[in-house]
Regions:
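Conserved core of the sugar-phosphate nucleotidyltransferase
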Residues: 120-198
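Phosphate- and divalent-cation-binding pockets in alpha/beta enzyme and binding domains
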Residues: 21, 67-70, 101, 122, ...
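Short catalytic helix/loop segments, enriched in acidic residues and glycine
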Residues: 28-43
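N-proximal low-complexity "stem/linker" segments adjacent to membrane-targeting elements
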Residues: 1-24, 33
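Conserved alpha/beta core of the MobA/IspD/sugar-nucleotide pyrophosphorylase nucleotidyltransferase superfamily
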Residues: 2-11, 173-260
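Conserved N-terminal catalytic core of the sugar/cofactor nucleotidyltransferase
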Residues: 2-13, 39-109, 200
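Conserved beta-strand segments of alpha/beta enzyme cores
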Residues: 32, 81-83, 159, 220-222
Length: 260
């Protein structure tokens, strides 16, 4: 029944990449440390996770890992809730390898999220309260999808059929938000699929959503629609402007609510 599941104790944040498409902004610092309304992206993410009851967060680092580790130490100290694992292959592989680096953490229910997705607690609550399925893919809709969107096709019951950037326009029902929840046998299925994918050279340059696509073909992935304007993905400089507007508004809204 929706809302009856406890939040998973674990979350994995994929923050190994540099973020080349942001140009000089990420020449010397990783994308996840870029400030939004005066607060680094990764801090927004972790604070939202902790506030929702998730008490173990693993951050996969790569580019300028020492800067991420320093920030996490300064902000969260040694309370045991936050840990990092280093992906030494970050510059020559894609995020499927970062998932493989963190596979030991995937021993029970966990959230997997991209290190460039900002989101509100309301989004997490919606996903965590969704009906239990092996894999829950958070999705959103918009009038027009661009070439960089990770597009999603659904069946009539909300099961994911396909996840791909190259879906034809007539097959697109939503886009992936970049946050996936694994429950029941989902963690084992995903971990086994990682091991299998990396037996082949093409797995080194693959996205983890290619595994979600494979699991979807077995009707194991259900979509969860998230609230509108509750998230933002940071890929290009224009996204930073959008994120600043969205999250400065949210901060103001929360401040006004607290004062009432």
């Amino acid at each position: 029944m929706a809302g009856s599941e406890k939040p998973p104790v674990k979350a994995i944040i994929l923050s190994a990449g540099q973020g080349h498409r942001l140009g000089p902004l990420t020449t010397s610092i990783p994308k996840c440390l870029l400030p939004i309304s005066g607060k680094p992206i990764i801090e927004w993410q972790i604070d939202a996770l902790l506030s929702t009851g998730i008490n173990q967060v693993t951050v996969v680092t790569g580019f300028q890992s020492c800067l991420i580790e320093t920030l996490l130490q300064q902000r969260y100290g040694d309370d045991g809730r936050i840990e990092t694992v280093f992906n030494p292959f970050f510059s020559i592989t894609d995020n499927l390898v970062s998932c493989w680096i963190a596979r030991a953490v995937m021993d029970r229910d966990f959230l997997l999220l991209n290190g460039d997705t900002l989101f509100e607690e309301i989004l997490l609550a919606r996903v965590l309260g969704s009906d239990p399925t092996p894999v829950t893919l958070s999705v959103d809709q918009k009038p027009v999808y661009d070439a960089d969107d990770m597009k999603v096709q659904l069946d009539e019951n909300g099961w994911v059929r396909h996840v791909s950037k190259t879906l034809p326009a007539g097959q697109i029902d939503a886009e992936s938000v970049g946050l996936v929840l694994f429950r029941e046998r989902g963690p084992l299925l995903f971990r086994d699929a990682l091991e299998e994918a990396l037996r082949h050279q093409k797995g080194l340059k693959a996205w983890y959503l290619s595994i979600i696509e494979n699991l979807a073909s077995r009707q194991l992935v259900k979509a969860c629609f998230v609230p509108e304007s509750s998230w933002c993905e940071i890929d290009f400089p224009a996204d930073l402007i959008k994120a600043e507007e969205l999250f400065s508004e949210k901060k103001l809204s929360r401040s006004v609510t607290m004062q009432r």
